[in-house]
Amino acid sequence: MDAAVEKIAILDFEASSLSEASWPIEIGLSWLEHGEVRTWSSLIHPAHDWEIDDWSPQSAAVHGISMSELTEAPSATEVAETFFKVLGGRRLVSDAPEFEIRWLDRLLRAAGRAENPSIEDFDGTSFAVFDGYALDLVYETIERRPAPHRAGPDTARLARGWLKASQHQAFLELEGRTA
């Protein structure tokens, strides 16, 4: 198992819409630990200062999360606390960091948190960690699984690509070969 990827968590959000005023409705993290994909996700109860009018029926049709499901969800403060516990110092990556940074910032501000973790690009990180056939395995594994558009399963899908590539690299190391 490549130790570099065990120090990284993949982040994804589902959101009220894709507009500038959008807010996070679900967060997901996946990471590799002891040769397995681990995943945590949570719905997010809308904060009082988030614009409820920004709810998009088109986005809801994609992720399948209803506004009524969010009324019973944990608060932004609870979700942020759990997020940092689960993150445990890992670096963050995402396949859409330009969106995730905005939604992470909204979540943390609503929770009164001052932290502002950076989010690296999934593709750039994949190319930095893997090469050759292992890199091919990352993307072949991802392409074979359609994105479910739910935060936890979406991050798990990407992490499975890294797991497959890491297993290949570990096999080559046992054989005394390189990628």
Model-derived segments and their meaning:
Residues 108-122:
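A short alpha->loop->secondary-structure connector
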